[in-house]
Amino acid sequence: VLLLRNVTVPALAFVSVSTITAAILVATGAFTLDEMAGFIKEGVKGVHGTAILFIFSVLFFGVMTDAGMFDKIIGALMKKVGNNVIGVTLMTCLIAIIGHLDGGGASTFLITIPAMLPVYKRLHMRRETLLLICVTSMGVMNLLPWGGPTMRAASVLGIESNDLWSQIVPMQVVGLVLAVGTAIFWGFQEKKRIAKLGDAAVEDAGKYDDSDSEEKNNELARPKNFIFNVILTLAVIIVLVMDIFPSYYVFMVGCALGILVNYRGKKLQNSIIKSHAASGLTMASTIMCAGVFLGVLSKSGIMEKMAIMMAGVIPVSMGKFLPVIIGILSVPLALLFDTDSYFYGLLPVLISVGNQFGVNPAHIAIAMVVCRNCATFISPVAPATYLGIGLAGVEIKDHIKYCFGWQWGVSLICLVAGLILGVITF
């Protein structure tokens, strides 16, 4: 509520609510101070990697932008698509789908948003649309057997993730079609909106090319290092996808090499780092405070109790329709439960309830995995969400308001498709 009503910044909202909750739990004797301190440490421990990743990824892409690498790349892209807004949205969808083959939300945001955001700016397209297309595509691709939600659900069922995924495939295919449809639909929406801005905006975007005019006016541009910067960026992305080292370490090394090669001298290097510090630290602090929030609510068992309460609300007469009910509610629930609490807390409870009515546990899991995934990257309790909105420069409340209805719709269509195709039965 604090986030959506814009009462305060996310970091303060997370730490305030979690501190008040912790104080109440300690005061009532539910937990000791030492136990609560442990919960907080565990919560921060779970997100500190993402926070560090955000700091150094922002710095890395900031350095590449300063050096003028993206100016040339975007110039080439603009020549290909021209003023074709729909072409841009389809390209966004394609990059997000391919980028999410590794199942990592953070890496997909890092690949897609820095590459496409300058194009959106040039064409006067909304950043929220960029994020919406990204999260729709990523939500569908996150169903892969090595994706976190599928693996968690499979572990609860006691089966291999490949076995669960093989049942999900028909719904995933429908989801991919919806992702492409999302790109086309919102491409038309953006095209109409830009038309209302007047021809000047479109003409301004169409005049863009990859000449050195901007670089000459930018004292930080390093056109001679373009090839090196492209190779460095590709190397960083490849190592990220290979998952050999922690993501944040890859960006640490990338930052070090990028700054050392492009900018000589301690004074200039310090200036470059400071110029990107504000955006990186602001979002990193939000992620760390979200970790405190998750630690208190998850480790104290509050989320698990919420899951049990949710299961208890379902009428006995509706028991056999449990997969459909949970499928319909999955998107709103994604905003309340983190991934672990959702699958390790709520799923086992619902399976036990479903057993009383002869409901196939796999069908409950499939409904929860597919429908919930649509909202994974708009959830305020998912650390990767903050990486995405931070890179795009969008407020969390605006991201949720812009995407929630659409993601819920995609989720419901996937659910109906599952029923029609026989993936989920009564």
Locate the predicted segments by residue:
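Membrane-core helix-loop-helix motifs of multi-pass transport proteins
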Residues: 118-205, 220, 360, 384-426
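Membrane-helix interface "capping/anchor" motifs
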Residues: 2-13, 121-129, 265, 274-275, ...
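Long, contiguous bundles of hydrophobic transmembrane helices that form the permeation core
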Residues: 1, 20-24, 28-29, 166, ...
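Transmembrane alpha-helix interface/packing and boundary motifs in multi-pass membrane proteins
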Residues: 2-8, 61, 95-104, 135-142, ...
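Core transmembrane alpha-helical segments of multi-pass membrane transporters/permeases
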Residues: 37-71, 97, 248-249, 256, ...
